[in-house]
C-alpha cells in the first residue's frame, strides 16, 4: 500500500511509521490511529463521536474531551504540519488540504 501523505507528513502503514519532513516522529497507538483515520478521510469532517467509536471502540458524549486531548498532543508532535488538522467548531476535526 502507498504511504499516506499530507503536507510534510508521511505515514507508512506497513512499517507503522510516521515522518514529518523526513524526520521520524514517535506517536502513541491512539495518536497514530487518529492520524491515519484523518488522513484517509482527508477533507471530510469527522465528528468526535465517529473518532471515539473508531479509535476507542465506544461512543460516549462525556468522553469527547479524550479526543480533544489526543488531537492537541498529536498536533504538537507534528510541529507546523499539525495545523493541517483543522478544528470544525462544534462538530469535530478534519485533515485539511494545505498548511
PLM feature spans:
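Basic, amphipathic DNA-recognition helix from helix-turn-helix-like DNA-binding domains
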Residues: 1-5
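C-terminal edge and immediately downstream basic/flexible tail or linker adjoining helix-turn-helix-like DNA-binding
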Residues: 94-99
